[in-house]
Curated annotation (Swiss-Prot):
Molecular function GO labels: rRNA binding; structural constituent of ribosome
GO cellular component: cytosolic large ribosomal subunit
Entry protein name: Large ribosomal subunit protein uL3
Annotated segments matching region Disordered: 125-146
PANTHER family from the UniProt entry: 50S RIBOSOMAL PROTEIN L3, LARGE RIBOSOMAL SUBUNIT PROTEIN UL3C
GO biological process: translation
Gene name for this UniProt entry: rplC
Organism (species): Metamycoplasma arthritidis (strain 158L3-1)
């Protein structure tokens, strides 16, 4: 098992070399520090405790200072344990290079809070009949239905009732890493993930899927625009180019065609 802590930045879309649009989520992954290593012998289970993002000086408590000193780091804001993550020592640093493009991961975060909601929105219950006497009395339109047997003398725990919707820990499984960018502390994940913008997320290796997909070949927009400009220039000189060529190869063929065109113009000027 392996995992890392990050922060959701937002969603955007990318294009593959085949022109397919992919919705993706950008996750900022600042370097994580190993602040504790838990073992079966000492703690009863194996895990690695990770921490990220420095705390403000005004929020630091004295006990925390000594704890983080042992890991040779400053007090951190977010601390989480990754179960069964082994092979790391106290003070080690983990960055976005932990995951590679094509890997399948599970992402956990606190979902968006949507405030107080009724049973129809919160639990997807049916709306009551809108005609034939419905909408009130014994056939309410949006009211909660039965919440238990009359002989129970109490409401059993777990009944689907109105209440606070959202703000719960949610995990979405089997999401694909589209791109990793350790230089910019960034991971690009295919699809949407839980949480609002700026939410703390935990990215772990998928527990149900062990295989790795072939990395998606993303379109390089700058390169594509440069090639389009070369294609437009090539039309003037009847030069055949294709998208499989590199920019250097295309530029070389175009330069040769321009040079030949100039050489053909020079004798014509001398004859005149």
């Amino acid at each position: 098992m392996k995992g890392i802590l990050g922060r959701k930045v937002g969603m955007t879309q990318l294009f593959t070399n085949e022109g397919i649009l992919i919705p993706v989520t950008i996750v900022e992954v600042k370097p994580n520090v190993v602040t504790k290593v838990l073992t079966v012998e000492k703690d009863g289970y194996s895990a690695t405790q990770l921490a990220t993002e420095d705390k403000k000086a005004s929020q630091i408590r004295r006990p925390e200072i000594n704890k983080f000193k042992q890991a040779n780091t400053t007090p951190k804001r977010f601390v989480k344990e990754i179960r069964n993550m082994t092979g790391y020592s106290l003070g080690d640093t983990i960055d976005a290079s932990l995951f590679q493009a094509g890997e399948i991961v599970d992402v956990t975060a606190i979902s968006k809070g949507k405030g107080f909601a009724g049973t129809i929105k919160r639990w997807n219950q049916h709306i009551g009949p809108k005609s034939h006497g419905g909408g009130g009395g014994s056939q309410p339109l949006r009211q909660t239905g039965s919440i238990g047997d009359i002989s129970g003398n109490r409401v059993w725990k777990g009944m689907t009732m109105p209440g606070h919707l959202g703000s719960e820990q949610v995990t979405i499984q089997n999401l694909e890493i589209v791109k990793e960018d350790p230089a910019n502390n960034m991971l690009v994940i295919k699809g949407s993930i839980p949480g609002a913008k700026g939410a703390l997320v935990v990215i772990k290796k998928a527990i149900k899927t062990s295989h790795k997909k072939e990395a998606v070949q993303l379109l390089n927009l700058k390169e594509a625009l440069a090639k389009n400009e070369l294609f437009e220039q090539a039309k003037k000189y009847n030069v055949e180019l294709n998208m499989q060529m590199s920019i250097k190869e295309m530029q070389t063929l175009l330069d040769e065609a321009i040079k030949k065109a100039e050489e053909q113009k020079q004798p014509e000027g001398e004859n005149k």
